[in-house]
Amino acid sequence: MSTGVREVTVEGGWPALELVTAGARVQLIPELGCDIGSFVDARTGVDVLWRVPWGIPPRSTGPFSAATETEWGERFPGGWNVLLPNGGAATPAPGGTTWGFHGEAALLPWTVLGSGVDGERAWAELEVRLIRAPLRLHRRLELVDSALAVTETLTNLSSVPIEVMWSQHPSFGAPLIAAGTRIETGATVTETDDTLTDGDLAAGERSTWPHAPAQGGSAVDLSVVPDFATHRLVYLSEFETGWARLVNDDLGLAARLEWDASVYPSAWLWQELNDTPGHPWWQMAYVCAIEPGTTYPGQGLAVAKEKGGTPLLLAGGEQRVVTVGLSTEAP
């Protein structure tokens, strides 16, 4: 397939951009938070990203800040989102406002600045200006063969220093994710979320990769997707280099995620494996997300700070740049 960029319409009636090379096909939805809705590996025909069970919501505008996880879920399509200026529960923000669940960037419409082809490279550039925070986020996506590079430039437009949570939320689904799928990473430390009340992991416990303490006191091996229903939230840290890989030997396919650990020193490992019986998953979600970011735990900025998390501090006018890569390859 020749390299190109084209305009398409995806589920829900949303206009989308499709970047195509000989190695992959990537779709993004500018009006829905610049969500990267699919990444199809050309060799196997597998879409490595996950979509929510209810599908992409109908095309609409707003709300752009979710007071609760339920409101967020009504406009959450799955795929790969960017979370800014908050991650997790809604949190008090400067000026007496609130930053909603997972922030604004994944809900606001983004402006397409340009797209095109440069040799074997398909590219697109987009940006968004947040409403409840004086921030602009610019995103350049470049697809070469089966490797997507997403470079984000975050700018504090004000003269006032501001603390934020900034993270990527790529979520992976079946058939890449299956019982026995292997998880490899450069992390050396694991810490389970301290609000876990069920599932198979003990809450608020540290260990060394690939282990995490189980509720019964034994050790769980996080490097293999289990063959039973459960849900997990674990924070990975102390990266030698910022990378993780999901490997399905039966498919002969791996997805590799890479990032700059000096900007994103931690990553959230979230799994919902047909477990939660009520809203929002109803035992219908089978997903594994590896989410590099600035800060944990994923409980909102104020709570994260109370629990020792380190937000990203942007001075007035400061810019920060990070590149996150997603590629597919043979194991």
Where are these regions (language model features)?
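Surface-exposed acidic/polar loop and edge beta-strand patches at domain peripheries
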Residues: 1-149, 160-163, 170-331
